[in-house]
């Protein structure tokens, strides 16, 4: 059972050609057949089928279907859903169940979405390969010896393998966009504050955003329109109006579009295949009438350095709550309270999470706060100012999503600094809080996906999705098999 996007599925459901029960049963069978790929941490078999029957009955009663009627959706395992296990792919949250729904979950349920399961991820969203998961890595859909990217690797693989039509992810420094690039799908990080973070387990609160992974821009835009908007439970969510994203996309023309091409995004160290494929996509936009404008932006290396100081500092505070006292894993061999805290965290957290907690604690310590944390905040301000200036000259900023194609499982695990560079082109948008999207534009010489990365000004998701749709159409990348 295959569909040409959600509109195809919706029309077949509303015409009576298919039922939600048939569709969800088919998706669940495919999920079960892919169990060895470790894509899902939990599959909602009974819940999804019950929901499908409920929606079929709703349609039979003549009630109006919701905007997302019957859409099979996967949820990253760090977004709360009442009554469902929530682990963040970490041993320390073993056995924990959400006691409330995230705002995005409530809004999607209200529009008749169907959740098929939770997806694997890097532990607490810390990683770029999905290898930092307590339940093991996820293979890339195009080469099972390689990574799908991270930290939303399970969500990306679910969409690429057609196990969900859309998946929710979280993006702190590229965790939606980078795996989307590695898996040949769309990966959208909205403007900071566009989507409520209520119910998202915090990694770095001033960076975290819930994002979307989808096979095409239309499906991403549809879901974005449902989940975007102010939320009383999240003080950082924005009052900015939520437009009709499909209409905004339709008004976007490539002809006359000013595309900013930063020198910093095409360094000599960029993988030759990646550079060639991304530049070919840029050329197609130019041939369609776009104007290419070379612009100067701060070197991305500075963004990476500032980013890993700031996010680890925030993580060291946010993850202090996981101590074995109230929920999750508790070390069985602890003679006193202090030992219980130490042992539970030592045994419950993985190596990368512990590395980042220690780094964050260090940069916030009295003797180093000014040298590291304060300086990183100053660098963040410089990036914000420079990007605002850039958008006085251009409509969109263009570059590669990743400096290299999907790498082998295990290849970078012993070199965390090299792993961190996987996000070198995605981190700047997170530093400044602007919306960004990864768009599939082709394949390298080994047949591995390559993504292009677009950044737009604050709250210009509609324009960005319209440009991305043009680019994806021009490049006509093949679907995953």
Swiss-Prot record:
GO molecular function annotations of the record: ATP binding; glutaminyl-tRNA synthase (glutamine-hydrolyzing) activity
UniProt-listed Gene3D superfamilies: Amidase signature (AS) domain (3.90.1300.10)
GO CC annotation terms, alphabetical: glutamyl-tRNA(Gln) amidotransferase complex
PROSITE patterns given in the database record: AMIDASES
Catalytic activity: L-glutamyl-tRNA(Gln) + L-glutamine + ATP + H2O = L-glutaminyl-tRNA(Gln) + L-glutamate + ADP + phosphate + H(+)
EC number: 6.3.5.7
Name of the protein this chain belongs to: Glutamyl-tRNA(Gln) amidotransferase subunit A
């Amino acid at each position: 059972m295959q569909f040409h996007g959600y509109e195809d599925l919706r029309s077949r459901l509303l015409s009576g050609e298919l039922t939600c029960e048939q569709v969800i049963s088919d998706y669940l069978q495919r999920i079960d057949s892919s169990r060895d790929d470790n894509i899902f941490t939990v599959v909602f078999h009974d819940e999804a089928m019950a929901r499908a029957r409920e929606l079929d009955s709703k349609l039979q009663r003549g009630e109006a279907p919701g905007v997302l009627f019957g859409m099979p959706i996967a949820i990253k395992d760090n977004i709360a859903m009442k009554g469902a296990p929530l682990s963040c792919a970490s041993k320390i949250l073993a056995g924990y169940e959400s006691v409330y729904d995230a705002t995005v979950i409530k809004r999607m349920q209200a529009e008749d979405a169907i959740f098929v399961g939770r997806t694997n991820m890097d532990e607490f969203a810390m990683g770029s390969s999905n290898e930092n998961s307590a339940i093991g890595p996820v293979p890339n859909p195009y080469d099972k010896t390689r990574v799908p990217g991270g930290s939303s690797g399970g969500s990306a693989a679910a969409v690429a393998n057609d196990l969900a039509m859309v998946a929710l992810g979280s993006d702190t420094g590229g965790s939606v966009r980078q795996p989307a690039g590695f898996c040949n799908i769309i990966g959208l990080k909205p403007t900071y504050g566009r989507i409520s973070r209520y119910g998202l387990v915090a990694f770095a609160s001033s960076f975290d955003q819930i994002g979307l992974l989808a096979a095409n821009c239309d499906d991403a835009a549809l879901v974005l329109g449902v989940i975007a908007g102010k939320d009383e439970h999240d003080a950082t969510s924005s009052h900015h109006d939520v437009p009709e994203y499909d209409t905004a996309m339709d008004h976007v023309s490539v002809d006359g579009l000013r595309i900013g091409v930063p020198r910093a995004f095409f360094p000599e160290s960029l993988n030759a295949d990646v550079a060639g494929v991304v530049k070919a996509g840029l050329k197609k936009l130019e041939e369609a009438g776009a104007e290419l404008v070379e612009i100067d932006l701060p070197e991305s290396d500075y963004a990476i350095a500032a980013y890993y100081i700031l996010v680890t500092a925030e993580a060291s505070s946010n993850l202090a709550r996981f101590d074995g006292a109230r929920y999750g894993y508790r070390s069985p061999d602890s003679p006193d309270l202090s030992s219980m805290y130490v042992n539970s965290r030592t045994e419950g957290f993985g190596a990368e999470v512990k590395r980042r907690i220690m780094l964050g604690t260090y940069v916030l310590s009295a003797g180093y706060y000014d040298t590291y944390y304060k300086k990183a905040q100053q660098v963040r301000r410089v990036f914000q100012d420079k990007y605002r200036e850039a958008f006085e000259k251009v409509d969109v900023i263009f570059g590669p999503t990743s400096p290299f194609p999907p790498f082998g499982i295990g290849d970078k695990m012993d070199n965390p600094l090299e792993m961190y560079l996987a996000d070198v082109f995605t981190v700047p948008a997170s530093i400044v809080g602007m919306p960004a999207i990864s768009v599939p534009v082709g394949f390298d010489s080994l047949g591995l996906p390559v993504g292009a990365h677009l950044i737009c000004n604050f709250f210009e998701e509609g324009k960005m999705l319209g440009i991305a749709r043009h680019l994806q159409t021009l490049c006509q990348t093949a679907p995953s098999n």
